[in-house]
């Protein structure tokens, strides 16, 4: 067997239908497009969102809000994820090393979801009130 002799199994790749090749093909004459009208012409398609001349919905509805650029570099981490960090200190660098946040993240907030069973020192991260209580109850501490 050689690379130039390999071919797909018989019948696994049916040949595509060729339109406009006679009435016996099933796609002759109009080629599956029908008679006249905009959609039978060359280049005859309407753009996405076109509503027949009626004002389209994306223009009828107002613009609103904006996306804060800080949201692209901010993430949140749960207590259950903090427990996965090696060592007893959780900081931005250790979270990145553990693969819990992406490398472009600059700000992290610890939220109370799940439980932390061992003493962990959280440094340089924002912490919610409930998460702070849970960390301190487990014997850990929070350093701003």
Curated annotation (Swiss-Prot):
Disulfide bonds: none annotated. Keywords: Ribonucleoprotein, Ribosomal protein, RNA-binding, rRNA-binding. Gene3D superfamilies: 3.100.10.10. The keyword Acyltransferase does not apply. The keyword RNA-binding applies. It comes from the Bacteria. GO terms for cellular component: cytosolic large ribosomal subunit. Residues 21-35 have a biased composition (Gly residues). InterPro entries: Ribosomal_uL15 (IPR030878), Ribosomal_uL15/eL18 (IPR021131), Ribosomal_uL15/eL18_sf (IPR036227), Ribosomal_uL15_bac-type (IPR005749). Residues 1-59 are annotated as: Disordered. Binds to the 23S rRNA. Part of the 50S ribosomal subunit. Belongs to the universal ribosomal protein uL15 family. This is Large ribosomal subunit protein uL15. It comes from Alteromonas mediterranea (strain DSM 17117 / CIP 110805 / LMG 28347 / Deep ecotype). The lineage of its organism: Bacteria, Pseudomonadati, Pseudomonadota, Gammaproteobacteria, Alteromonadales.
